[in-house]
Amino acid sequence: MKVLGIDPGSRYCGYAIVEKINNKNQLIEAGLIKIKPNDLQYQITELCEGLDLIFKNHQFDEVAIEDIFFAYNPKTVLKLAQFRGALSLKILQMHGEFAEYTPLQVKKTVTGKAKATKEQVAFMVKRLLGISKDIKPLDITDAIAVALTHSANLRVKK
């Protein structure tokens, strides 16, 4: 079972492909779609082109994305919502349905604490996957955590 986990953002979109083999999760690939500062329409185009490459180079059984977090700046919320809409449409076109998780759900699943820090999430991601070296930036570990959360929820549903 291969899961694509996505952590959307306005500068970087983290992605991770995790495969469950014999009840053990393995990291297949993880990285970033870098979104250059530009007009919003060009940023959305960069995001969609980055997703196109991921979908063309890999096949997945499931896709999961992290819901946008609450931000105090209304402009940031609007921008993230527009990225999220474009991301959702692209996933629906390329794959079909997808799962969504709040940051609190992801943190709770991976660390056991809904209020865990990004560093605690990164530590547990490495531990759960048996990875010794640091994974940077944290957008990538967040995407891995989303994939692990969905993988765990699939196990519970079956």
UniProtKB/Swiss-Prot annotation:
This is Crossover junction endodeoxyribonuclease RuvC. Mg(2+) 2 binds at E66. HAMAP family: RuvC (MF_00034). Its cofactor is Mg(2+). It comes from Campylobacter lari (strain RM2100 / D67 / ATCC BAA-1060). The gene is ruvC. GO terms for biological process: DNA recombination; DNA repair. Mg(2+) 1 binds at D7, D139. It catalyses: Endonucleolytic cleavage at a junction such as a reciprocal single-stranded crossover between two homologous DNA duplexes (Holliday junction).
